């Protein structure tokens, strides 16, 4: 006798919406599917709803729903069935609204999004709204002043037309730099509201006890940081940490890319033993350590502090790794129980 199959818990969902050619599809393809930014120039418009599963690590798994740019509300066909938009908004965790910053005037791109915001909030008041002011990479955005002007324009327009009860955050993004990864990092963090405060407290304690300057918990595959300490995130520091991950993986591919049988492996060269220490010419040390399945702790500190506290750092990082498993332990225990229940029903 075989037990009925266990239904998997629905994954949290991130919904992308915005006008045609605003860059919705380019964003998630660059961040989560490793597409080169230049390749996105050849992407066509999204004719139908696209659903992608992101499951790079064992702790944070979610779906991306990419809506066609000409969607103007009402019903939508999903896998051959007509579904009302209220059901869609009710099941979402985050709604990402993408605005083309190169649209002139930018208010024209915002007009169609207001109804979406109001309709979604009416159905799901707990929904998080994230506005990506995208494509800030044109000739008119070579300095910070026009970027800030565009941000101010969007914020003012939204504030005048929607309720103050609606939670809206704004991000200036481009697929040609790390700003899009920083923006998506803050979106992904909304999917773990129960665990995020604990992770941030752990990272705060780590940098305080080890005299570090900054720390990130990275999803290695996407370069999205799942958590960071409460010190401000400087883009140069974030880019440096991302570059370190790239170099560490590239070196692992060259010198450690074989499996147990001695054959070349096509999997990402990153495992439970992965660790790297980079010493920069300016006296800074970058420290990378694997702490979970495709999860890496990356820290930045002064070389003098690292030399004095290397043993303490190793000990505290090991404690962090063990505690990380405990933070997500209820989730892992439930999944293990489901697997045991399924196997116990077989005879």
Regions found by a protein language model. Give the residues of each.
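Switch I (effector-binding) loop of TRAFAC-class P-loop GTPase G-domains
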Residues: 32-61
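Switch II of P-loop NTPase G domains
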Residues: 48-50, 59-119
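Short hydrophobic alpha-helical segments used for membrane anchoring or interfacial signaling
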Residues: 215-221
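Short hydrophobic/glycine-rich mini-motifs in sensory/regulatory modules
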Residues: 290-298
């Amino acid at each position: 006798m075989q037990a009925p199959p266990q239904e998997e818990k629905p994954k949290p969902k991130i919904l992308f919406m915005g006008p045609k050619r605003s860059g919705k599809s380019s964003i998630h393809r660059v961040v989560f599917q490793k597409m080169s930014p230049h390749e996105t120039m050849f992407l066509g418009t999204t004719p139908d709803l696209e659903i992608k599963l992101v499951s790079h690590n064992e702790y944070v798994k979610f779906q991306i729903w990419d809506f066609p740019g000409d969607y103007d509300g009402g019903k939508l066909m999903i896998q051959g069935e007509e579904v009302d938009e209220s059901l869609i908004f009710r099941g979402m965790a985050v709604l990402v609204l993408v605005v083309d910053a190169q649209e002139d005037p930018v208010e024209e791109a915002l007009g169609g999004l207001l109804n979406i915001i109001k309709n979604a909030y009416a159905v799901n008041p707990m929904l998080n709204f994230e506005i990506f002011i995208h494509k800030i990479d044109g000739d008119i955005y070579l300095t910070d002043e026009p970027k800030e002007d565009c941000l101010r324009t969007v914020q003012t327009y939204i504030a005048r037309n929607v309720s103050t009860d609606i939670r809206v955050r704004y991000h200036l993004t481009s697929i040609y730099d790390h700003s899009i990864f920083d923006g998506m990092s803050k979106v992904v963090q909304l999917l773990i509201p129960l665990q995020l405060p604990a992770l941030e407290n752990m990272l705060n304690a780590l940098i305080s006890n080890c005299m570090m300057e900054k720390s990130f918990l990275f999803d290695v595959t996407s370069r999205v940081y799942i958590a960071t300490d409460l010190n401000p995130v400087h883009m140069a520091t974030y880019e440096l940490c991302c570059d370190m991950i790239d170099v560490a993986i590239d070196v692992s591919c060259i010198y450690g890319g074989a499996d147990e049988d001695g054959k070349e492996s096509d999997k990402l060269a990153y495992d439970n033993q992965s660790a790297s220490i980079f010493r920069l010419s300016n006296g800074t040390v970058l420290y990378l350590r694997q702490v979970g399945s495709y999860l890496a702790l990356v820290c930045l500190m002064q070389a003098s502090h690292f030399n004095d506290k290397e043993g303490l750092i190793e000990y505290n990082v090991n404690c962090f790794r063990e505690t990380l498993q405990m933070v997500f332990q209820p989730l892992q225990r439930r999944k293990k129980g489901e697997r045991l229940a399924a196997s116990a029903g077989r005879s």
